[in-house]
C-alpha cells in the first residue's frame, strides 16, 4: 500500500537509491498503489555518477510492498521493504539489473522486461 509521501527503495541499478511517491496513477481519486502499479516519484537519494539524479521526477512500478497482498488462491505475500523500479517514457526499466525478488503481480501488469531481469519472482 503505497500512497503520497511514502518512501521506497530502488530495486535497480539506475543510480537512484530512494524515492518518494508523489502521485498514484490510475484515476483522480486513487489513493493507494500495490504490486504492479505505476507511481510518480521524486528522487530523494542518488549516487553521484548514476543515470538518475537527485530531485528528478520519474515514473516507477512497485515491485515489493510491506503491506500483504492477497492472491486469487487466498494466499498472502509481503516483503521486508517497499521497493520500485524506475521506468522510462516507453515503460521499460532504466536500469539493466534488478535487485531482490519481485511479486508475480508485476508479470500480470505486463512488465515482462522487469520479470526477466529479476533474480526471483514470488
Curated annotation (Swiss-Prot):
Pfam families xrefs: Ribosomal_L14 (PF00238)
Coiled-coil residue windows: none
GO biological process: translation
InterPro entries given in the database record: Ribosomal_uL14, Ribosomal_uL14_bac-type, Ribosomal_uL14_CS, Ribosomal_uL14_sf
Record keyword Ribonucleoprotein present: yes
GO molecular function, one term: large ribosomal subunit rRNA binding
Tree of life domain: Bacteria
Keyword tags: Ribonucleoprotein, Ribosomal protein, RNA-binding, rRNA-binding
Gene Ontology terms: cellular component: cytosolic large ribosomal subunit
Keyword Ribosomal protein tagged: yes
UniProt-listed SUPFAM superfamilies: Ribosomal protein L14 (SSF50193)
Family: Belongs to the universal ribosomal protein uL14 family.
Matches recorded under PANTHER family: 50S/60S RIBOSOMAL PROTEIN L14/L23, LARGE RIBOSOMAL SUBUNIT PROTEIN UL14M
Quaternary structure (record): Part of the 50S ribosomal subunit. Forms a cluster with proteins L3 and L19. In the 70S ribosome, L14 and L19 interact and together make contacts with the 16S rRNA in bridges B5 and B8.
Cited function: Binds to 23S rRNA. Forms part of two intersubunit bridges in the 70S ribosome.
Protein name per Swiss-Prot or TrEMBL: Large ribosomal subunit protein uL14
Amino acid at each position: 500500500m503505497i500512497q503520497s509521501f511514502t518512501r521506497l527503495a530502488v530495486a535497480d541499478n539506475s543510480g537512484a537509491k530512494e524515492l518518494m511517491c508523489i502521485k498514484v496513477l490510475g484515476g483522480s481519486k486513487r489513493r493507494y498503489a500495490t504490486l504492479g502499479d505505476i507511481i510518480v516519484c521524486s528522487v530523494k537519494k542518488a549516487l553521484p555518477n548514476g543515470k538518475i539524479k537527485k530531485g528528478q521526477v520519474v515514473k516507477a512500478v512497485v515491485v515489493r510492498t510491506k503491506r500483504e497482498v492477497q492472491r486469487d488462491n487466498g494466499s498472502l505475500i509481503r516483503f521486508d521493504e517497499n521497493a520500485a523500479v524506475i521506468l522510462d517514457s516507453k515503460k521499460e526499466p532504466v536500469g539493466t539489473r534488478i535487485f531482490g525478488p519481485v511479486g508475480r503481480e508485476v508479470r500480470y501488469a505486463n512488465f515482462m522486461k522487469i520479470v526477466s531481469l529479476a533474480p526471483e519472482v514470488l
